[in-house]
Amino acid sequence: MATIFFAEPELVIGHGRKVLFLNPGDLQIFKEIELPPDLTTCGLKTVEPVPAPGHPASSSKQQPAALKEATGSVKVEVSIQNVTYSPDRQLLALTTAGQKAVLLYKSRPENAQLLSIRPLARASSAPKVLQRWQLPFWSLTKREIAINTSVLRWMPRHVCFLGHLSIVYDVLWSEDQQYIITCDRDDKIRVTNYPATFDIHSYCLGHKEFVSGLAMLTEQHIISASGDKTLRVWNYTCGKELLLHELPAPAVRMLVRQLEPEKTYEVAVLFYDYVDAIGVYRLEQTTTESWSITSTQLVRAEAGTWNICNFALTDDRIYVTGAENERLTLRVYDSRNGERASGLPEGWLKMVLDNLDVAAFMPEDLSVWFKKRFDNVSDYLERKKRRIEEQKQQKCG
C-alpha cells in the first residue's frame, strides 16, 4: 500500500519500508524514515496471550501466527500501511503489515526519533493520533477500535472498547471529545458517547453502500463519502441529513480543506473505475442547518491508463499515486484545470521512486469493498415458470 498526504508544509509519502518528507514546491526530500527488515531489531516485543481457563490454547505450545510474526520466528516482509501526524505535528505514527505493529515517532525538523513500538493483533485500517499526551493512538481493525493510553509510557495492553462487525474505514473525534464517530462497510455512520462507549448516541443512516470517508466541518456537522455515489452532510448530534449530492461514480477516498472565508470547504473525492478519476467540489454553509455544493471540477488524471490508488491535495496541486506496469507511479495535476502541473523540477519522479526503492506494486483491490448481491427472486420465478409449464404439459398429456 502507498500512503500520501499533505500536512503544511510537507508532502509525506510512505511505501515499502520508507517514509519520505518532501517540499511540495521543488519536491526535494529533506527527511526520511526507513524501517529495518525485522522490527524486532528496533524493539518490537510481544506479550504472551493469557487464554481463558479450559481454552485449548491454554495447554497448547503452538504459537499464534500473529505472535510468530512479531517475534520473528516466521519471516514476513515488513511494509508501511498508514502514516499519520498528531494534531500538533509533534508525533508521527506508522502502522505496518507483515509484522503488524504501530511505531510512534517524535517528529523533528532534521529527523524522527522512535519513541515506542508496539505489536498489533490485526492490521490497522485507519489510524488516528489525537491530542498529544492524552489518549493519543487509535488503531482501527476489522472489528475493534483500540486505544493505547500513553505515549512514552504505554499501558501493558491496549484497550478495546468499540465493536464493529465489518471493516472500519474512518474515525473522527469531536472537538469536545464527547463523541467518537466511525464509519464502516455496512453503510452506516455511528456516533458513540465517550467515555461511556457502551452507549450509542446516534446513527447517521441513509447510505446504501460502504462509507469510505468522514471529515469534520463544524462542531455539529460532518461530511461523508460513500460507494453509493453520494456525498452527504450530517448534523451528527441528531443523525439528521442536511445535504445529499450525487456523484458520477462510487467514492473511495475523500479529502477536505477549509478555505477562506469561514464555513467554506474544498472537498476532493477519488472515484472508483470512472473516466474522471477525481472530483473537486466547493462546499458552503448557507445557514445554520443548510449546505450547498457551489462548484465542481473534475480531474481526468489520465484515468484508465494506470491504476490510481491515492492522492493528496494542496493549495493548487493534486499529487496522485498509482500503479503503472506493476510499478509505483506519482503524478501531479493542477487542481484548477485538471491538467498536468507545469514547472516541476526535471527528474523529480525518478528521484522519489529511487529513494523509495520500489519493487513490484499492486494497489488494493477495491472491488471487495462492495457488497455481493444475490438475485434469488429471478431464480425462483424461473423455477416457478418451468413448474407451471410442466404441469400444463402433464394435463395436456
UniProtKB/Swiss-Prot annotation:
Organism of provenance: Drosophila persimilis
Compartment list: Nucleus; Cytoplasm
WD repeat windows: 75-115, 163-202, 206-244, 303-343
Entry protein name: tRNA (guanine-N(7)-)-methyltransferase non-catalytic subunit wuho
Keywords attached to this entry: Cytoplasm, Developmental protein, Differentiation, Nucleus, Oogenesis, Repeat, Spermatogenesis, tRNA processing, WD repeat
This protein's pathway: tRNA modification; N(7)-methylguanine-tRNA biosynthesis
CC per GO annotation: cytosol; female germ cell nucleus; male germ cell nucleus; nucleus; tRNA methyltransferase complex
PROSITE patterns associated with the record: WD_REPEATS_2, WD_REPEATS_REGION
Function of the protein: Required for the Mettl1-dependent formation of N(7)-methylguanine at position 46 (m7G46) in tRNA. In the Mettl1-wuho methyltransferase complex, it is required to stabilize and induce conformational changes of the catalytic subunit. Required for binding of nanos mRNA and repression of translation by the mei-P26-bgcn-bam-sxl complex. May cooperate with mei-P26 and nanos to derepress the BMP signaling pathway. May cooperate with mei-P26 to suppress expression of a subset of microRNAs. May cooperate with mei-P26 to regulate bam expression levels in germline cells during gametogenesis.
Location (main, coarse): nucleus
Record's miscellaneous remark: Wuho means 'no progeny' in Chinese.
Source taxon at top rank: Eukaryota
